[in-house]
Swiss-Prot record:
Keywords: 4Fe-4S, Cytoplasm, Iron, Iron-sulfur, Metal-binding, S-adenosyl-L-methionine, Transferase, tRNA processing. PANTHER family: CDK5 REGULATORY SUBUNIT-ASSOCIATED PROTEIN 1, MITOCHONDRIAL TRNA METHYLTHIOTRANSFERASE CDK5RAP1. It comes from Campylobacter jejuni subsp. jejuni serotype O:6 (strain 81116 / NCTC 11828). This is tRNA-2-methylthio-N(6)-dimethylallyladenosine synthase. It is found in: Cytoplasm. GO terms for cellular component: cytosol. Monomer. Residues 4-119 form the MTTase N-terminal domain. The keyword Protein transport does not apply. The gene is miaB. [4Fe-4S] cluster 2 binds at C151, C155, C158.
Length: 433
């Protein structure tokens, strides 16, 4: 019997990418589906959604409306992920042609969903047996691995605890075996995923070997054949000295750190319920630069959070100047349902929010130009992962710069030393040496 065709579109973060991989594995290995990039020939159309900001939620309904117009007769449409978790039955009301709704903590029920009319799975609790999935990887050379699920922080602007539930650490033996299996299949790099990875080990579903995130990094680095370990996202509150020292000194841990700032104002951080101050954040970031001079630090920043004054915004700009981030992900505050910030007084007007965002992004662009210029004539070890147009190939350095050289498919999955000859804001161009 010929395979049925599966089309899947993934929106949002790396955790969504991994969730999509899990669903692909279940469907291709257990239900006789094969992936297609042509939505018109698909028997099953999935969209894996994001709800961190309002825009992706609006995009969901425009996308599924488009799917309904082009799908072939008899094809099913499933809405999965975080927006599915928090909207639930409203999706059926607004898009009655959707066949099932599957929340972020219910992806293991995908085979049940495709067989049940108007199936809706939006629970945010987990049974530990659901940590074990069939396996599929979008990349041979890099493997995403969940180490925790959910979040206990309840930051006042964030909907994630309402869509992914409370934080649970995945048992070490499951993580280790998954990493080992990925390396046996050709992975050179593993990418550990969680809302707050460096809070690992604080809460397991049942009794398991006790270890913290630093211990986990050290244990995983013993896997023979594994060359690189990346992770996202750590929480600044849990960046103790042990963690920073393991990060700096373990040669397999990539020297790229995502440190979500959100705001440089201690008052706004308190209103956000982030748990740290501007002073704590700067202490940790500058300590990291001291321990690991070649580290690349990225961050998330929200401007125009309710009550943010010009002085508060200047505090954020001050952190930008002091830390000099290699990369920022910056956004205007987006009011999310179910969050405390949505009903806070002193919501900021759109004009002020746009001005602050432009000021932040423009200054960071200037800083980034200075940073990348200093990379010219340096030599980096690059893992090549992606073919580019014009007989080119791209990969990343240990500290996460994107590097492009002339090269062909035979370089995929290989490490090469590359000398940078022309540094641009988004890409470093170079030559293999």
């Amino acid at each position: 019997m010929s395979a049925k065709k599966l089309f899947i579109q993934t929106l949002g973060c790396a955790m969504n990418v991994r969730d999509s991989e899990h669903m692909i594995a279940e469907l291709t290995q257990k239900e006789n589906y094969a992936l297609t990039e042509d939505i018109k020939e698909a028997d099953l159309i999935l969209i894996n959604t994001c709800s961190v900001r309002e825009k992706p939620v609006h995009k969901l309904f425009s996308e599924v409306g488009g799917f309904e117009k082009v799908k072939k007769e008899g094809a099913k449409i499933g809405v999965c992920g975080c927006t599915a978790s928090h909207l639930g039955n409203e999706i059926f009301k607004r898009a009655p042609y959707v066949d099932f709704v599957l929340g972020a903590r219910n992806i293991s029920k995908i085979t049940q969903a495709i067989k049940t009319p108007k199936f809706m799975g939006v629970d945010i609790d987990y049974d530990e047996s659901e940590f074990a999935f069939a396996d599929f990887r979008n990349s041979i050379y890099k493997s995403y691995i969940n180490i925790s699920i959910g979040c206990d922080k309840h930051c006042t602007y964030c909907i994630v605890p309402h869509t992914r539930g409370d934080e649970i650490s995945i048992p070490f033996n499951i993580i280790y075996k998954e990493a080992q299996k990925a390396v046996e299949k050709g992975a050179k790099e593993i990418f550990l995923l969680g809302q707050n990875v460096n809070n690992y080990g604080k809460r397991f579903r049942n009794e398991h070997k006790k270890m913290d995130f630093s211990d986990l990094l050290e244990e995983l680095s013993t896997i023979e054949g594994l060359e690189r370990i990346r992770f996202t996202s750590p929480h600044p509150l849990h960046m103790d000295d042990k963690f920073l020292e393991v990060f700096a000194n373990n040669p397999k841990v990539c020297k790229s750190m995502h440190m979500p700032l959100q705001s440089g104002s201690s008052e706004i951080l308190k209103a956000m319920k982030r748990g740290y101050t501007k002073e704590w954040y700067l202490n940790r970031a500058l300590k990291l630069r001291e321990l690991c001079p070649n580290v690349s630090i990225s961050t998330d920043i929200i401007v125009a959070f309710p009550g943010e004054s010009e002085k508060d915004f200047e505090e954020t700009m001050d952190v930008l100047e002091k830390v000099r981030f290699e990369q920022i992900f910056s956004f205007k505050y987006s009011k999310r349902p179910l969050t405390k910030a949505a009903t806070m007084p002193n919501q900021i007007d759109e004009e002020t929010a746009s001005r602050r965002l432009s000021t932040l992004q423009n200054r960071h662009s200037e800083i980034l130009d200075e940073i990348v210029k200093k990379q010219e004539n340096k030599t980096f070890k690059v893992l090549f992962e992606e073919l580019r147009a014009g007989n080119s190939i791209a990969g990343r350095t240990d500290n996460n710069f994107l590097v492009q050289v002339e090269g062909s498919e035979e370089l995929l999955g290989q490490f090469k030393e590359v000398k940078i000859t022309n540094a641009k804001r988004m890409v470093l161009y170079g030559e293999i040496v």
